[in-house]
């Protein structure tokens, strides 16, 4: 007599094996407070999309998204510019503490015709989330059939690690590993080291697989604004920009240093006074005067935004010698295409050369000469942006996240800690 349980047992073993083959790892940061931090998502466009359409996918400000990628916002109608498929962007998000771990739940998605949880996770959001994670985040909604217009919460990975990496200011990027990536290539691309990446992600060995999500520390400039300022804690990664004070102020991280430089933004909005009190200095003005005793510097600096007022500080200092001009990251023109010959190269170095600077991470690289304004003039670069992981950030853990796709034969969710496996 045949054992009816044997085929079922073999079936479950096979299903389990297939599921484990599709398992990806991600780093989770435990937390206990209600504080938030700025974080970044590494996102590769799955199709041509307008700037506003990309921003809408993540419910972020389109102008801030452009500046996070050093894209010039002075171009006419830049928010409706069509960005090419395969372009890699850094998406600025707010990282919260939810159910004891760091994640972002501020992104919502309305389903469209032919959507599945798999296509939403793998295609629309580029593997930053799994179908199972979407299902868990929307457990009160019947997802057996996705009706057009169903509103879904999209849980996205993020990390804070106290805004530091090896005791230096840092912002963390959630990066989805591609098939051609190596740890050395990722480390080189984002100006870090394999050892640091391994420590931050609590990896026993620097082994990665496609679909893994790494927390990548980006060196940054931190602010020192008063706690009552709405932009208290602003941190900007090197080579990027940030808008603050209601789009009135544009800040950057000076290349080769940890100094944040702020000046009036290049977009037209109604703003409060940007003049330093009891002076003729405007926000961002710096003067130097060399004398026999040294260099006298006078600076009108940004000090935060509070109650609709732009706070400024006038400071004077004496230094041994006068500093050279600010070395700020070049702004680039809104990209129209992604060079095919660069689309599938391994992660390149972020170090600028005379011809290229990489902004197209997961998909490709784009020429990053200073952007030419619509009138033909060159736009001067006038700004930039932004774990205690000497032995890895305290409390960071690597776990196996959920499989990236469903298996059609049976859907059996087995919760294990913070992860769900689908057989």
UniProtKB/Swiss-Prot annotation:
GO terms for biological process: defense response; immune response. CDD domains: LysM (cd00118). Disulfide bonds join 31-97, 37-160, 95-158, 97-160, 221-253, 248-276. The keyword Disulfide bond applies. Residues 395-423 form a propeptide. Pfam families: LysM. Residues 1-24 form the signal peptide. Glycans are attached at residues 162, 238, 285. GO terms for molecular function: peptidoglycan binding. It is a lipid-anchor; GPI-anchor. It comes from the Eukaryota. Its main location: membrane. Residues 107-154, 173-216 form the LysM domain. It is found in: Cell membrane. Disruption phenotype: Impaired sensitivity to peptidoglycans (PGNs) leading to higher susceptibility to infection with virulent Pseudomonas syringae pv. tomato DC3000. A lipid is attached at residue 394 (GPI-anchor amidated glycine). PROSITE patterns: LYSM. Required as a cell surface receptor for peptidoglycan (PGN) elicitor signaling leading to innate immunity. Plays an essential role in detecting PGNs and restricting bacterial growth (of Pseudomonas syringae pv. tomato DC3000 for example). This is LysM domain-containing GPI-anchored protein 3.
